[in-house]
């Protein structure tokens, strides 16, 4: 009997270790390639959404999308976890200054290495648009209140 309990415990430890980085995420968060994500149905301005993200977990910010795979993951997270799908979802990027160019950094400080624009405008903040199944970026007025996705 003792041997059975020891073996069962050993298998449990192995199974838990094989689950990967998902075990490192807070409850209610989802993992993708070593990062944790959570979709929030709270309606906030871009700045307020960023503040909420930083209060949720250590190192958290509005999501920074760095690949098409991550874009697909975030789109799926939004559609599966939000009851009411509005037109836009905040992401952690905004235009800085008067030039119609994207700032070279996400709100978490990482460089922009992947872009997926619908079209570039100068409304200063960016979000994902429902019409593109939340896969394309669109400029939105920063004072508009939208749901958002945090990444830690």
Curated annotation (Swiss-Prot):
> Gene3D superfamilies in the record, alphabetically?
Mannose-Binding Protein A, subunit A
Tissue distribution: Expressed by the venom gland.
Which positions are annotated as binding Ca(2+)?
64, 66, 70, 151
Signal listed as a keyword: yes
Q: Which Pfam families match?
A: Lectin_C
For this UniProt record, the keywords arranged alphabetically read as follows: Blood coagulation cascade inhibiting toxin, Calcium, Disulfide bond, Hemostasis impairing toxin, Metal-binding, Secreted, Signal, Toxin
Q: Which GO terms describe its cellular component?
A: extracellular region
State the species of origin. Answer: Protobothrops flavoviridis
Report the function annotation for this chain.
Anticoagulant protein which binds to the gamma-carboxyglutamic acid-domain regions of factors IX (F9) and factor X (F10) in the presence of calcium with a 1 to 1 stoichiometry.
User: What name does UniProt use for this protein?
Assistant: Snaclec coagulation factor IX/factor X-binding protein subunit A
Which GO MF term does the entry hold, naming one?
A: metal ion binding
